[in-house]
Regions:
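Repeat-blade elements of multi-bladed beta-propeller folds
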Residues: 8-26, 30, 57-84, 119-146, ...
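Structural core of flavin- and non-heme-iron oxidoreductases
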Residues: 21, 36-39, 47-48, 67-68
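Beta-rich strand-turn-strand
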Residues: 82, 93-94
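Beta-propeller blade signature
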Residues: 88-93, 150-164
Length: 169
């Protein structure tokens, strides 16, 4: 029956199951590690990105996380609503102090010489790790709304350091 339906909102993240631990995120960018059999919380991390506001044209949502490892180091990456790329240690749930500034890279930077309204850009998909790079796309309006509408850049950052590597547009 129709009257039993439950509105789930805009939450669309897909959990990751890695080595017996389930990792997932909330719409507001919190990341958790759970025991998939019991639901017991192993750790949680809250970047508090909701305090930075949300994009003008997008509901509060963070679409997912990415797992990366080089065989020795393992990280979870998330691009937050607050325009941050965060590297989280999978064992501790703490930001990686060697990545960006204490685990955070400011995604409001590295757009080149363009000037635009920063509130008009966000991320419509989780980051993706390829080799030693973390790649993040952009979610923008599909048409020019303002004279200073943002570009739809794709950018790459070093998975170890968070250093900006390249931009495609």
């Amino acid at each position: 029956p129709r009257n039993i339906a439950y509105a789930t909102g805009d939450y669309r993240a897909v959990p990751l199951l890695i080595k017996g631990v389930m990792y997932t995120n909330t719409n507001h960018g919190q990341v958790v590690a759970l025991n998939p059999a019991t639901g017991e919380l192993i750790w949680s991390f809250d970047p508090e990105s909701y305090a930075l506001g949300r994009p003008v044209f997008s509901p509060a949502q963070t679409r997912g996380i990415e797992y990366w490892t080089d065989g020795n180091i393992s990280r979870i990456f998330i691009a937050t609503l607050g325009k941050q790329l965060v590297s989280i240690d999978v064992n501790t749930g703490k930001p990686d102090p060697n990545f960006g500034e204490d685990g955070f890279v400011d995604l409001r930077d590295n757009f080149g010489k363009l000037e635009f309204e920063i509130d008009n850009i966000t991320h419509g998909a989780p980051p993706i790790a390829v080799g030693d790079s973390v790649i993040i796309g952009s979610k923008i309006f599909d048409y020019t709304l303002f004279n200073r509408s943002p570009p739809g850049h794709v950018r790459a950052y070093d998975a170890y350091t968070g250093e900006f590597k390249w931009r495609f547009y």
